[in-house]
Amino acid sequence: MKKAILSVSNKSGIVEFAKALTNLDYELYSTGGTKRVLEDANINIKSVSELTQFPEIMDGRVKTLHPAVHGGILADRDKEHHLEQLREQHIDLIDMVVVNLYPFQQTVAQPDVTETDAVENIDIGGPTMLRAAAKNFKHVTTIVHPSDYNEVIERIKNHQLDEAYRKSLMVKVFQHTNEYDHAIVNYFKDNKETLRYGENPQQSAYFVRTSDSKHTIAGAKQLHGKQLSFNNIKDADAALSLVKKFNEPTAVAVKHMNPCGVGIGQSIDEAFQHAYEADNQSIFGGIIALNRTVDVKLAEALHSIFLEVVIAPQFTEEALKILTQKKNIRLLQIDMTIDNAEQEFVSVSGGYLVQDKDNKDVTRNDMTVATDTQPTEAQWEAMLLGWKVVSAVKSNAVILSNNKQTVGIGAGQMNRVGSAKIAIERAIEINDNVALVSDGFFPMGDTVEYAAEHGIKAIIQPGGSIKDQDSIDMANKYGITMVMTGMRHFKH
């Protein structure tokens, strides 16, 4: 029987994963909080102490640091003398290690964190097990991200848990532990930058960098301009997160944490022009994120309007000469690699909330056309573009998009039809190829009816309301095509 060690701080999906492993005849071992969660779910789980014949000591600081664990993980199964030594020491082979680490980054990001809190959230046993298992990827499966659970189970079922896949998991492990170590170094080397003020002048503020990864705002290289403000940092992070969702040349304009214009194109110049045309008023004083190099042509366009921050993976020398003529504009060079961080957190009074990032992608094949009328190809393209954008707009969010840009954005209203009204009132165009995109389902048919009255012919929304049929009937009445994604994008 194969053996797996499960020890996770992020419990998302661990119960379902453990059940699946049990059904596949894995013997499970765990520690502390993970073990309690699995026991509460009536999963047959053993303590790691049964492997080590040694208790957890020092408030859990020493649990898995034992030859019975690391020998079972590190043994090279192609070497008979390794296996003989295991038999002599009565050590069992470990086939899978599932570990994610103490939440150090989340802990040190809290404004009231103490050094003691930080120290207690430095994981020792977890990285050691991960690195050991990753080193022995030829024989051991190592999982650090909950998003890999489902694929691992499917591969086990289909006998496809091969060395090449285990090697890909190994790379994720060393990338993860590298970022974790960087966060610890950055915290203890006093990586706190005092800002001029916070959201408003009466609020003091500082910026704590828990990572210097070059694909994050914290690790950005500032090429020009004065110090980033508190609001600049938040807006820049929002713009960066959205532009990374796109593969094609894309420009994202953000104002007060909401996109005000998003454009795609055959070139980055064309993409920026589409974003600018989407709302040439709101872009004034905003943040622009671009996922391609800024050249002279684009620099001239950017120079012609007032912008607080421009983000791009590269700027040509000629582009920099143009843009640096404005002394206050901030130019940030950032790697557009997708951030591997799987969680985000928000401070609340007395604590903080932690959740998985809303980065699950839905493809056209995952969606359902709920109406009699099928979308045209242009409508599909408009809906897919809009569906990416709406995830970055404050709820209730309703936006309009065509296949190259947003054309109207309604954000942050307390009722959905109110957001729809704003999006439609501000629309730069409405025609058959413009889609209305909603981040949540329609509780009744009024939004669809309002859209129909203003010429909308395509709608995409999550579905899931007990009154979905009302919206479907309303769409059919007006000959509107409506697609349901099965997934919502609330953003608070």
From Swiss-Prot:
Domain of life, per lineage: Bacteria
Annotated TM spans: none
Signal peptide: none
GO molecular function: IMP cyclohydrolase activity; phosphoribosylaminoimidazolecarboxamide formyltransferase activity
Catalysed transformations (reactions): (6R)-10-formyltetrahydrofolate + 5-amino-1-(5-phospho-beta-D-ribosyl)imidazole-4-carboxamide = 5-formamido-1-(5-phospho-D-ribosyl)imidazole-4-carboxamide + (6S)-5,6,7,8-tetrahydrofolate; IMP + H2O = 5-formamido-1-(5-phospho-D-ribosyl)imidazole-4-carboxamide
Pathway noted in the entry: Purine metabolism; IMP biosynthesis via de novo pathway; 5-formamido-1-(5-phospho-D-ribosyl)imidazole-4-carboxamide from 5-amino-1-(5-phospho-D-ribosyl)imidazole-4-carboxamide (10-formyl THF route): step 1/1; Purine metabolism; IMP biosynthesis via de novo pathway; IMP from 5-formamido-1-(5-phospho-D-ribosyl)imidazole-4-carboxamide: step 1/1
Pfam families: AICARFT_IMPCHas (PF01808), MGS (PF02142)
Entry-linked SUPFAM superfamilies: Cytidine deaminase-like, Methylglyoxal synthase-like
Boundaries of every MGS-like domain copy: 1-144
HAMAP family membership: PurH (MF_00139)
Family, as annotated: Belongs to the PurH family.
Domain notes: The IMP cyclohydrolase activity resides in the N-terminal region.
Protein name: Bifunctional purine biosynthesis protein PurH
Originating organism: Staphylococcus epidermidis (strain ATCC 35984 / DSM 28319 / BCRC 17069 / CCUG 31568 / BM 3577 / RP62A)
The encoding gene: purH
